[in-house]
A protein has these predicted regions:
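Conserved "repeat-terminator" motif of extracellular CCP/Sushi domains
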Residues: 86-93
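Structured interaction patches on ligand/partner-binding surfaces of diverse proteins
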Residues: 37-84, 178-212
Length: 239
């Protein structure tokens, strides 16, 4: 989509020639592609609300966005002159993966980790790189059953960015037969995600150890010990 002033065009090839005569003046030249879970008004992208069990609750937004690219430039147009413009598209969605390694005698009894992350950006003005609407996203943890990481739990989401003063992971860890009782997990990811909004062309994987998984029926809660970046293949997209 190519909006310029009161003109909006749609292009599917590498070049776009507007069939439109622009009055002399200053314009914001913007280019962006349609992406799942994202709507655009002017130069502000807004994430759709979450669906499913979290729909309409506590400002939860979509956690599986399509790949979204943008470009903006301020241009001054003079009368009777053609302007060739090149749009170097910028990736605006980044993939985040969290890998958790449970420890303790009850680690093997974990059946489910119900979790969400706070401080995800719900909007982005891509002309000014302004993130807003601090929102929550579901972290869909599943157990890894094969390979070197078997026994760990992993969640992958795609985010427009992070915003606000903090990003907190909150979860309830559930066990087979209700033994032990569910454990509450809270972990601060603010420091680990402080550079998340830069370098979006590279995926980010963070790993941490869950200590200490409770034993028996007594539950005091759990925490993640030392989030660290896990190096792996970059995940990006070509427009």
């Amino acid at each position: 989509t190519v909006p310029i002033g009161d003109y909006t065009g749609t292009e599917t090839s590498a070049t776009h020639t507007p069939d439109h005569l622009f009055a002399p003046g200053s314009y914001t030249f913007a280019v962006w592609n349609p992406a799942e879970g994202i709507t655009v008004n002017g130069t502000t992208a807004t994430i759709a609300a979450a669906t499913g069990t979290r729909a309409g609750t506590d400002a939860f937004v979509n956690n599986a966005l399509g790949w979204f690219f943008t470009y903006t430039e301020q241009v001054t147009i003079e009368k009777d002159k053609d302007y060739p413009l090149t749009a170097a598209m910028k990736q605006q969605v980044r993939e985040l993966t969290l890998v958790v390694e449970p420890t303790g005698d009850a680690a093997g009894r974990i059946t489910e980790i119900v979790a969400h992350l706070t401080g995800a950006a719900g909007t982005l003005d891509f002309a000014t790189d302004t993130y807003g609407a601090a929102s929550n996203v579901v972290l869909p943890f599943t157990k890894i059953t094969e390979g070197d990481d078997a026994g760990k739990w992993k969640a992958t989401v795609r985010l427009l960015g992070v915003t606000g003063t903090e990003q907190l992971l909150t979860a309830e860890i559930r066990y087979a037969d209700g033994n032990p009782s569910p454990t509450t997990l809270k972990s601060d990811l603010t420091e680990a995600l402080k550079e998340f909004n830069t370098g979006k062309g590279k995926s980010l994987t963070l790993g941490g150890t869950l200590v200490e998984t409770p034993e028996g029926m007594e539950v005091d809660g759990a925490e993640i010990n030392g989030w660290e970046e896990v190096k792996g293949d970059d995940v990006n997209a070509d427009l």
